[in-house]
Structures are given as C-alpha cells and as structure tokens.
Amino acid sequence: MKYPVLYEKSETGWGAYAPDLPGLGIAAKTLEEAKELIREAIAFHVEGIREHGESIPAPFATTEYITI
C-alpha cells in the first residue's frame, strides 16, 4: 500500500506523519532521517495491525498543492 506522508520542518529538526494512520508520527534531526524513520514506523504499525488480526486501513488522504 502507498500512504501519503507529510513532512514538517521545525526549529529543531523535522517531523513526519501519515494522515491515514492516526497517532503515527516521528521526529528527526534531518529530512533524510525523517524519511527513514516514518517508513520504518509505518511498516511496524502495519505489522502490528496484522498480528492483531485487524484489517489494515486503506489509504484515503490525497494531497494537492495550491498556487496563490
């Protein structure tokens, strides 16, 4: 499955979260680290869902850039 991920820069580093997986987010010092950590977090989260016999949520969020 393909989940959209949002990356946000802060004064101290980067945050990332997947809107389709509530409560799942990471913090990192660099964007590269954030990309690696969110990928690992999503995989771990989905694995946990499977282990509990629950259905994996289908991606539903979409993204768009709007020019003003």
Give the residues covered by each predicted segment.
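Proline-rich low-complexity regions
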Residues: 19-22, 57-59
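Short, charged, surface-exposed hinge/linker loops at domain edges
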Residues: 1-4, 36-68
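Short aromatic-glycine-(Arg/Gly/Cys) micro-motifs in beta-strand/loop hairpins
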Residues: 7-21
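A short, exposed loop/beta-hairpin motif centered on an aromatic-Gly-Thr core
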Residues: 22-31
